[in-house]
Amino acid sequence: KPVEGFILDLKEEEIKVSFKIKNILSVENEEPVITEEDLKLINFLREEYLCKYIDAIRLLIPVGILKGAKSKSRSVIVYIDDNLESIKNSDGYLEVINFIKRNTGKYTKSELTKEHGVSLYKLNKLIEHGLIKSEKEIVFRYNTREYNKDVEKKLTAEQSMAIEAIEDSEENLILLKGVTGSGKTEVYMRLVEKVLTEGKSAIVLVPEIALTPQMIERFKGRFGSNVALFHSKLSDGERFDEWYRVKEGKASLIIGARSAIFLPARKLGLIIIDEEHENTYKSDQNPKYQTKEVAEFISKLKGCKVILGSATPTIESYYRAISGEMKLVELNHRIDNRPMPEMKLVDMREELRSGNKSIFSRRLYASMQQKLEKGEQIILFLNRRGFSTFVSCRSCGYVFDCENCDISMTYHKNGFLVCHYCGKTKKQPNLCPKCGSKYVKFFGAGTERVEEEVRKYLKNAKILRMDVDTTRAKDSHEKIYNAFKAGEADILIGTQMVSKGLDFPNVTLVGILSADMSLNLPDYRAAERSFQIITQVAGRAGRGEKEGEVIVQTYTPEHYSLQYAKKYDYEDFYEKEFTIRAMMGYPPFGRILLINGIGKNEDELKKQMI
């Protein structure tokens, strides 16, 4: 069976090897699909992430090419000349050639005859005499939709200063730290516009496809067909087309998820990584690359600027920025100086003591009723990404932690608690070691149950859900987004997908149903992730003329992550988290490696690995 391969180098001298070298049966591509710069990137991926050549190559080459996909084309009729002297009895030809002249390259021969009543005989005659010709035109299978024109927004003084600081920066690596609603997207667009006018290209990365409807709407509305979109929901043919458009210079602005970083952009001048704190920029499939590291390498390779944008940067990125490894640019105020929405922490232990066993606190329920009466919209957020069944006491909020690693232990169905860092196990106690309560349970609730509860208590509310189940179909995120934007629903229930990037002026209440879900992940970044997600979700409220309100439900309201999030105090949170990381030796003070072993005999495998 023939095997596909890539030629990376040519050697004139004979190479002696211990294996049989097979002949090349055919060369699939007339022109190289891998450039010298690509080879440098491939070698970086191999050395940095310990992957095979072919795994690195596949990141750069779309699946469509590997499966033999080609550009889709059609033959259109193109005008050449209207000199009819060579045609005898040319009556009636002038009307035909004038129509083609007005619509050159627009219609196929079949469309001209069937839809516009043009005689096939006359078309063939005009082709025969060289007055028109049939020409192949590439048909792109995606992204043909027209978008409303996006008008440039007037910049605030702070935005103008940020743009100037970035453009004048001698450093190519820049952290743009801007509070939610501060206008980071408009800053991105102005920077992209400058790069494009210089004849260069730009890449704008977003964490996942859920964010792209609004980003696409704005960027396509501003830059039109010059935008290429690249993400996992495209078919192989569509991915090939977008790759081809970028390679041929037909699209200079790329918007996509992490894989878009590998597109063959011509004269790359700018890479923007929006919401840089998101863990979706790290690939969990081979090769397990970190997009930010790849972007930094490309920046050194091509001399382009890289902007990491976030309201809540990772501890590592902020540490690098304040220690001078990258330039720090800040946007500290919302557009029109709108206030950040007021955030309230609700102690769910008190709710339980008062006899309320609903997933909604009395405060959240009352606020939901008020907003619905005013015709305002609500977002209910349930953080289930990386969801882990931790065990907690509902009476006092105690969570069963590992004494060695200071992270929550995970509940397993055999009744044991396991630390996924050091492997420590212990049987789940029946009583809380802190308060002696019997009300010890593992934690969990899904979006479907939340929807049921809303329908039970707020019967007239119109509800939309945005989660993995409701967004499997193509363009489903955009349909839900557009429906909520158009006011077709009062309440949007969602997971991580609703936490950022969405701008709904009529949303005045955000309810975070359980801050404890992210706070008790078995991960040293649990506090950081909680601070980030709460700040990001809170930023969805009060983005219009009306003030917003955020209600956070938790069994541990005293936790420093929630207390700093309530005040939108990133700097003090950073100082606290930084101190803890230093004590524990966690990044940026050390590196954590996960080494997986696969074998039939567990004891033998342990010996080999140790």
PLM ranges: what are they?
Residues 203, 223-234, 403-404, 410, ...:
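Conserved RecA-like helicase motor-core motifs
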Residues 364, 373-457:
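Cys/His-rich short segments
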